Regions:
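Conserved mixed alpha/beta catalytic, RNA-binding, or beta-rich assembly cores of soluble enzyme
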Residues: 2-44, 53-324
Length: 324
């Protein structure tokens, strides 16, 4: 019989996941129950995708600001260093910054402009043009930024992130100086000790700093890579991919994800006789044309997946074939 339905995506409702839960069993059982209730047949190469958030929650993979601060003090014992290129996000960075500030005496906060790495804008390009500001070469103090652009709030959240981050640091009893620049090496005029908070460009940023005379350089994926006073950790990504859980706690990106996907796949294979692919996913990596935000604040789109999902797409563009 001719196939009339293409790829179908279904959301499977599962129980609330808590720390200590067997995530592999819960996922497999939820999928099997849903398939039975809805009369969904299983086929080889079906894909079960699990959000990273529930995997991390089941692992109890959390860290609080005191634990982050302790790790920061071990990395920057002088207490004076720069925090450069953080993304502008209360969910993604505010609690991390709070922990960083609690472990510091003075922070030089250097923000990229007109936007952060994932497209959250402090200001728009037209404003730069009208003021004659060159983002490729000009380094702005907070005073210069205010004199040029005044108070600018995020279009969706209504937050002035320059003020928000500055106040968050100072409220922790830490001295702060704000700079806006896009060349990471600009920070070396202020300090030789740097915490790189960019995500996808962090390797290059660290290399440029070390080649240019920086003394101590760490990236976010090097913070909280092992347990601190009983905290969670991520040995591969550190604080990258973390999300705000409470005012003083972050949920870290999940770890040991290969074991999780293999366990889920094995349980589904045993129950169905089919080779079902499994992946853990994070941000979708789309770009919003209105807010100009590129939705990829996680270090990777998928921290783990089964072998059948390996490789690059190999597809035919049907509309091109139809026209030719």
């Amino acid at each position: 019989m001719e196939r009339l339905i293409g790829t179908v995506s279904r959301g499977v409702r599962a129980p609330i996941i808590r720390a200590g839960d067997d995530i592999a069993s819960i996922v497999a059982e939820s999928v099997l129950k849903a398939a039975s209730a809805e009369k969904i047949p299983f086929r080889d190469k079906d894909v079960v995708a699990v959000t990273e958030a529930v995997v991390a929650r089941s692992q109890g993979n959390y860290a609080n600001t005191a634990q982050i601060a302790k790790d920061i003090r071990s990395k920057f014992p002088s207490g004076e260093f720069a925090v450069i290129f953080p993304i502008l996000s209360r969910n993604r960075f505010s609690v991390c910054l709070k922990g960083i500030a609690q472990g510091a005496k003075k922070i030089y906060l250097m923000l990229s402009y007109p936007s952060d790495e994932v497209g959250n804008h402090l200001i728009d390009m037209d404003s730069l043009d009208s003021k004659g500001v060159n983002p490729y070469s000009d380094v702005l103090t907070e005073e210069q930024y205010r004199s040029y652009f005044g108070i600018v709030k995020h279009p969706f959240t209504g937050v002035d992130y320059v003020e928000f981050y500055r106040d968050l640091i100072s409220d922790c009893g830490c001295e702060v100086e704000v700079i806006l620049a896009n060349d990471c090496r600009s920070i070396l005029k202020y300090t030789k000790n740097v915490l790189c908070c960019d995500i996808h460009t962090r390797v290059r940023t660290k290399r440029l700093l070390l080649e240019s005379g920086a003394e101590t350089v760490y990236c976010l994926d090097e913070i909280m890579t092992s347990s601190v006073d009983g905290s969670g950790y991520n040995d591969k990504f550190g604080l990258l991919g973390s999300n705000k859980a409470t005012e003083d706690t972050v949920k870290l990106f999940p770890r040991d994800c290969d074991t999780v996907v293999q366990s889920i796949a094995a349980k589904l294979r045993a129950a169905t006789g089919k080779n079902i692919e499994v992946m853990i996913y994070g941000d979708g990596a789309f770009k919003d044309p209105v807010g100009k935000i590129w939705e990829l604040a996680d270090p990777v789109v998928s921290p783990a997946y089964t072998e059948g999902l390996e490789g690059k797409p190999n597809e035919l563009k049907l509309k091109y074939l139809a026209d030719n």
